Amino acid sequence: QLKQQNIMIAKSKAIREARLKESINIIARAMQSGECNHSEGVIRLTMLLMPFGKTLTPYPSMAQLHEIVHNMPTHDARKQLEKKERMRLDLARERAEAKFEHEIKEELRQFLDDIKQIGVI
């Protein structure tokens, strides 16, 4: 009974890890192709890397962009802001994305290579 439970737990963990790795790959590729803006991408990647005990620290531009945008309100919290404040935050986010765009594209190549070579960085 216990052995079967442990097998099921291990299978579930492997399935979850595979799903997380696939999501990491999809988001990084979407960032590379422009389907996902870099701000949203770094926020999502940060969350997906956490279960593996990893961060974006090896990728300084992605890490810096995350540091700038991760506390910006989203969804309902964003809707509650006055239009002027929303515009100010949008401008700050867009400025940061533009500042790091070239470096992030370079880092994404390395990030995707790292994921391939060792599963998850």
What are these regions (language model features)?
Residues 1-121:
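Acidic, Ser/Pro/Thr-rich low-complexity regulatory regions
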